[in-house]
Each structure stands twice: as structure tokens, then as C-alpha cells.
């Protein structure tokens, strides 16, 4: 806890989110913009709000997020992970419910590297018989 803020770091793919929560009216600000403005797609906004809806704290926290790296979906996942960790920092009793929903575990899937002699990670060069 930093002052009256609770903190959580979230990661997904190459995105990293630093999340600060405190008691408030339910405002979510991501990189200085409201969440509805920052995440253009509805799915991104939905992913970000999932841990708050699950715990019933959608209107009870002001959330300040700093996120960088990756794309829109990765950033949404990182913010969700950060909010989850910040909620656990605020009240450890929320951990079982969040863990049951799968929000506490970091999604370890990363992009597979491109191999030499292949066009992509697994896509081989076209074979020519003649």
C-alpha cells in the first residue's frame, strides 16, 4: 500500500500495467484517458472490468493505470491482472474468488520465436518437388 493507494502490477504478452486503486466513485483512467476512450473495442473494456464485477466493487474504487507495450488485447489482459493484484493487496479475502475465476494466474503464453529456415515460427518454406 502506497499512502491510501493499493498497488498491483499486471503482465500479459509484452504488456506491463501498473495499477493503483483507492476508495472512490468507480472512475477508471488508463494512461490519462477514461477506460472507454482508451480501449476502443468493447471486449477490452469488458476484460478490464471483469475482476471488479466479480467482487462487486465496480463503483467503489477509483483506478489509475499506466500501461505500455504490446497491443490492445495484451494491454487489456495486463490491466485485468494488475487490478486483480491490487484488489488482493486491498483485501486478501478476495483472492479465492479471483483465483477461482482465473484472474490471479498470469497467462504465460508468449509469441513463439521464428526459426531459421522457416517462414514463421512453424510455417515451413514451400516444398517444390521439381
Swiss-Prot record:
Pfam families: Ribosomal_S9. The keyword Zinc-finger does not apply. The keyword ATP-binding does not apply. GO terms for molecular function: RNA binding; structural constituent of ribosome. One of its GO terms (biological process) is translation. It comes from the Bacteria. One of its GO terms (cellular component) is cytosolic small ribosomal subunit. InterPro entries: Ribosomal_Su5_D2-typ_SF, Ribosomal_uS9, Ribosomal_uS9_bac/plastid, Ribosomal_uS9_CS, Ribsml_uS5_D2-typ_fold_subgr. Keywords: Ribonucleoprotein, Ribosomal protein. Belongs to the universal ribosomal protein uS9 family. NCBIfam families: PRK00132.1. This is Small ribosomal subunit protein uS9. It comes from Bordetella bronchiseptica (strain ATCC BAA-588 / NCTC 13252 / RB50) (Alcaligenes bronchisepticus). The lineage of its organism: Bacteria, Pseudomonadati, Pseudomonadota, Betaproteobacteria, Burkholderiales.
Amino acid at each position: 500500500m502506497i499512502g491510501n493507494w493499493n498497488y498491483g502490477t499486471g503482465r500479459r504478452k509484452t504488456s506491463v500495467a501498473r495499477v493503483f486503486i483507492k476508495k472512490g466513485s468507480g472512475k477508471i483512467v488508463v494512461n490519462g484517458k477514461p477506460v472507454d476512450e482508451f480501449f476502443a473495442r468493447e471486449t477490452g473494456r469488458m476484460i478490464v472490468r471483469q475482476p471488479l464485477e466479480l467482487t462487486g466493487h465496480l463503483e467503489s474504487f477509483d483506478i489509475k493505470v499506466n500501461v505500455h507495450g504490446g497491443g490492445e488485447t495484451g494491454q487489456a489482459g495486463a490491466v485485468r491482472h494488475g487490478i486483480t493484484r491490487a484488489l488482493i493487496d486491498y483485501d486478501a479475502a478476495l483472492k479465492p474468488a479471483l483465483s477461482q475465476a482465473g484472474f490471479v494466474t498470469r497467462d504465460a503464453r508468449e509469441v513463439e520465436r521464428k526459426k531459421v529456415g522457416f517462414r514463421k515460427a512453424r510455417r515451413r518454406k514451400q516444398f517444390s518437388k521439381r
